[in-house]
Amino acid sequence: FAQNGVMLYVPKGVIVEEPLHSVLWGPGANIAHVSHILVLVDEGASVTYVHESASPDDPQGGANSMHAGIVEIQVLQNASMKFVELQSWGRHVWNFSHERARVERSGNLDWIFGAIGSRLTKNFTELDLAGEGAVGRMSGFYFTDGNQHLDHDTQQNHLAPHTTSDLLFKGALKGKSRSVWQGMIY
């Protein structure tokens, strides 16, 4: 179940020229946000999709909120997707997400993460290169300060021959903030 979500289907052979954009805006304190993003890019299709999750900081201080999110992406044969995911939750939000993508034969996924918000973020991300010639890139940037903690766990699985993946995360930390990245390429 989810309170908020997006379902995006790009039909076979359709090339979406302009980026698509969605925003999950989560104002308020002491509440939980549950979201689910489901994307299917059919054979030979192409799309750029930008998703933002954001909220203001708690003006009174002392409150806590939570976000639990799921992202599922399927890029079929000869399809291409650029997925830009931006997170700027308020400093009172505890953010947890599990995200998974599967790229089929000669498909291409460019997955870009940007994180500047939340009290704590724990993100699990898996990329399955399931078809021969599949290509996947995961890149991210983050800027933290105060007592923020960002934790990214990435996994790239080469399940078929002649697949290619690339990974690059960079960030800057200020104050007592912390960041953890761990990952594996199989």
Can you annotate each of these PLM segments?
Residues 1-186:
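Conserved beta-strand/loop scaffold segments within soluble protein domains that form the structured core
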